[in-house]
Swiss-Prot record:
Belongs to the UPF0102 family. This is UPF0102 protein Mpe_A3766. NCBIfam families: PRK12497.1-3, YraN family protein. Gene3D superfamilies: 3.40.1350.10. PANTHER family: UPF0102 PROTEIN YRAN. It comes from Methylibium petroleiphilum (strain ATCC BAA-1232 / LMG 22953 / PM1). It comes from the Bacteria. GO terms for molecular function: nucleic acid binding. The lineage of its organism: Bacteria, Pseudomonadati, Pseudomonadota, Betaproteobacteria, Burkholderiales. InterPro entries: Restrct_endonuc-II-like, tRNA_endonuc-like_dom_sf, UPF0102_YraN-like.
């Protein structure tokens, strides 16, 4: 039996290969921020650099089928907030943070959809 984690890890591998072929460069993988007493931590699946220098924070969602609205529909507002929180933490390492965006790679079976600027930090 394949675990959910194994499916997710496989999806991240496929998404990374797809984005590298598109010309992005891997900066970091599975960047995690610890939570606090009232705040859950966050994780960014992939951090990449686009050709124009933009830092790209990528959430990867993998589903076997398109049922229940598909993979992209599972990136809820709460999940977006956690990703943004982790990205803000990540950006603190820069004296002058580069431009950034939040992408989603949705994998449904064999189909891969790359949603550039899927959400913003507001």
């Amino acid at each position: 039996m394949v675990t959910t984690k194994a499916v997710g890890d496989g999806g991240e591998d496929r998404a990374l290969a797809y984005l590298l072929r598109a010309g992005l460069k891997l900066v970091e993988r599975n960047y995690r921020v610890a939570g606090g007493p009232r705040v859950r931590g966050g994780e960014i699946d992939l951090v990449l650099r686009d050709r124009d220098g933009t830092l790209v924070f990528v959430e990867v969602r993998t589903r076997a089928t398109r049922s229940h609205g598909g993979a992209a529909a599972t990136v809820s507002g709460v999940k977006q907030q956690r990703i943004v929180r982790a990205a803000r933490h990540y950006l603190m390492r820069f004296a002058s943070p580069p431009p950034c965006r939040f992408d989603v790679v949705a994998i449904e079976g064999e189909h891969i959809a790359w949603l550039r600027a899927a959400f913003d930090a507001s």
